[in-house]
Every structure is written in C-alpha cells, then in structure tokens.
Amino acid sequence: MKKLEKITPLEENFAKWYTDVVKNGELIDYGPVKGTLIFKPNSYGIWENIQLQFNKILKAKGIKNVYLPLLIPESLMKAEFEHIEGFAPELATLTKVGSKNLSENIYLRPTSEVLFQKFFKAEIESYKDLPKIYNQWANVIRWEKTTNPFLRSTEFLWQEGHSSHESAIEARKFTREMLKTYCKFLRKFLAIPTIMGKKTPREKFSGAYSTYTLEAMMKDGKALQSGTTHYLAQNFSEAYDVNFKDSENKKQFVYQTSWGLSTRLIGAIIMTHGDNRGIIIPPFVAPCQIDILAFNPRRSAEIEKFVNQVEKILKKPFRVNVDRSDKTLGFKASQSEIQGVPLRIEIGPRDFENNQVTLVRRDTLEKQSVSINDIVKVSRETLQAIHNNLYEQAKIRLKNNIVEINDYEEFKQEIANHKFVISPLCCTTAEAEEEIQKETGATARCIPFDYQKPGENKCLICKCMTKRFVLFARAY
C-alpha cells in the first residue's frame, strides 16, 4: 500500500504545496527530457473532458476539427519574420536525420499560424468560400528556460483555432466572440472566474495586430493567463498570399484570427480550487465524479452485493470509481481527497443495514446520509452545488483582491501584498512596463473591458490625464 505523503500547507510555501499536490494527486510523472510530462489518468482524464465539452461548443458553432503536421520547414516559417522572431528563443530545430544533415532546418511547431496559411491558401478562392474556421487539438514544443508542471513545459497539449474572413469587422467580431466563449466555458465547466481584456502592445502575441486574454487569479494572488484570442488582421495572409476574389472579382487578402487554450488549465484548476488536503477537481471535468468507498467489502458478501447495487445505479449518469481494496476506509477517504474527487460515497456496516449511504463533499467535507432510492437525485444536486460553491469562492476571492491605485508607491505596496492592481496608464511604451516589472515583478496583464471609467485620471507614471486603465499583477 503506497503511503500518502504530507502536503506542505499552501499558506506556508505555495510553490512547494503546488508540487506536493501535483505529485500526490497522481497527476503526472516527469518525462526523460527537462520540461516534459507524463500525464497520468487523473490529469489526462481532465483534459479529455475539457476536449469533450469544448468539442460540443465547436460543433454547435459549425467549427470542424483538423490536424496539421508537427514539422514546419524553415522556408515556410521565415515568410513571417515578426512571428519567428518572437518565438526564436523557444524554437526546437531538427538539423539532422541519423548522420545526414538536412538540406533545410525543420522546426517543431511552437504554434500553427504558418501551417494554416498553406492550408487556407489551398481552401480559399472566392468570397463565397469564406469564412473558413477550423480547430485542431495538438501538442506544441516550446523550449522554456524555466519549467513548472502544466504552467510552463517544453511540450504541452492545446486547442488552437484559426479562421479566415472576408472583412476586418467580421474577423474582429469573431475574435471577441471566441474570448467570450472561453470565459463562459471556464465559468461553466471549470468554475473559474476571469477578467477579460486586451493585451498591451508589449504583451501581445508576436505577429498579431491585437491580442485578447482571460486572466484568472490563483490562491497566491498571481495571475494566470487562461485563454487568448488574436486578431491577426492581414499580417499572415499578406506574407503568405492567402487571398480571394471579392464580389467585384478583385483580389483581396483575408482577415484572420487565432485562439487557444491549453493544459495550463489543469494548473489553473489546481491553484484556484485546491486546499491543504489536495486538489479539488470541478465536477463537470472530473475524470471520476464519485468515489464509492466501502468498509472491507470483500469480507462480506452482503456488503459486496450492496456496493455492486450502488455502482449499478450510479455508473450510467455519473463517472464512478469503486475502491474494493482491503485498505482502511480512512485511507481510502484521504486518497480520494488528495486526488480531488468531487464527491465520495462511504459505505459502512450501518449504512448497509439501513439501505443508505453517506455522501461526503470534497469542497466542504460535509456529510449527508442518503437513501439508496434518492442517491441519483441527491448526487446530481450535490455535484452542481459543489461546482457553484467552487465558483463563488473563487469569485469572492478575486473581487476582494482587486484594488484601484493611482499612486505609484501604493501601487508597489499592493503588488507586494499579492493584489491585482488596476491603475490609469497612458504610457503605452514597452519601456514603461519594463520599468514597472523591474521594480515590482508585476506585468501588464490586460486592459480590462469592464473597468474603463468615464472622464480622465492621472497616469500612474507620468501623471498626464488618461482614460485607460491597465490591470497589473505578478503572474505565472
């Protein structure tokens, strides 16, 4: 029987707590190359459920899945210099096959914008072919200097969508639509509240005209970018000659977007909802929604029969696991808590005798005795209540830790206090943001959509009057 290791309290050392819960929650093993991960069933199951639910959303929008190659020739990449320049430090490059040097370097995809240009060019001839919108589920390679499971890794999994449109208005509208879709998805399935906004020029995606983001607050007060959408304008289509004939038979370049979310969301789940007992997985993406734990079922044919009956009732409407091992009920409960199963059912001798079970919520640890006849109804209601509570707790924490500051000395203090700070800023230069980051460790997360006030305020740095507010925070 594997011993359950002690988890460092998150208040004591958040980074160590994160490492402990990732390890003890049976989420990963480390791969043989720095920054690579082996996704265990408990983490890959989360990703599978994210895929399942998001694919339903894509299908409802009429968006189809495709898969493009992992390998990109250097000649194709170089056509969009600004794009390759932004990724240059992270590009993994193949130069040899066996002992033979390649005639051209091959890149392992850091993202797929350039590959989609070749695809779109073959797909689009007329305005009647537009819009073209595709999604792919893929792995990408970015040679990160500093790695952290799920948050920054050499290889990670993601969803990336790409679209081509007839007009700038249509493409811009779709960029915002997908950001709202991500926001709703995180709220509905991951129980994570976010702040929507536009990235500053310094923080936008290389090659994009503008980038939009969802910023989530982790329990240590740091921000985590949890989904982005990019309005690419004609930056890529002009470089790769992706054009169409308009209604007047004139050549035009398409307007494009790209948008993605990744396995970084697993890290967001851990750091938004986890506690000192382990991880807490939101019910609608949990690989196992209900753990059925019995007191030594193999020692009693009657209890084993009762456990089988409970499993049969629950396994159709829910994702269920039954622990039939001879481990103690206390050990099983602790293991279930560490692994973040939203709801567990404990079955002891008295429960069996009364034809009932004990339901235990992972989020509050509240216990409830339920008749086997009501178990489906109560389990469904309880799982929804768990999701709602996780979201409300995260929403309250976000609201209570956002402050508006106009004075730079106060700004530095609040950043040191692990707050999200919203401040007026007219200084749009990268140098101003670099200076703030150097002094405080905070970066400009976004220009929030919902926090732009009428009238003008003094800029945090130069004191000129501005209408623009920017969200700053330390971030992963």
Swiss-Prot record:
Q: Where in the cell is it found?
A: Cytoplasm
Q: Which UniProt keywords apply?
A: Aminoacyl-tRNA synthetase, ATP-binding, Cytoplasm, Ligase, Nucleotide-binding, Protein biosynthesis
SMART domains on file: ProRS-C_1 (SM00946)
Gene Ontology BP term (one): prolyl-tRNA aminoacylation
Reactions mediated catalytically: tRNA(Pro) + L-proline + ATP = L-prolyl-tRNA(Pro) + AMP + diphosphate
* InterPro entries the record matches: aa-tRNA-synt_IIb, aa-tRNA-synth_II, aa-tRNA-synth_II/BPL/LPL, Anticodon-bd, Anticodon-bd_dom_sf, Pro-tRNA-ligase_IIa, Pro-tRNA-ligase_IIa_arc-type, Pro-tRNA_ligase_II_C
Recorded superkingdom: Bacteria
Entry EC no(s): 6.1.1.15
GO-annotated cellular components: aminoacyl-tRNA synthetase multienzyme complex; cytoplasm
Where in the sequence is the signal peptide annotated? none
* Molecular functions per Gene Ontology: ATP binding; proline-tRNA ligase activity
Q: What is written about domains in the entry's comments?
A: Consists of three domains: the N-terminal catalytic domain, the anticodon-binding domain and the C-terminal extension.
- Binding partners and assembly: Homodimer.
The role this protein plays is: Catalyzes the attachment of proline to tRNA(Pro) in a two-step reaction: proline is first activated by ATP to form Pro-AMP and then transferred to the acceptor end of tRNA(Pro).
Tell me its family: Belongs to the class-II aminoacyl-tRNA synthetase family. ProS type 3 subfamily.
Protein name in the entry: Proline--tRNA ligase
UniProt organism field: Mycoplasmopsis pulmonis (strain UAB CTIP)
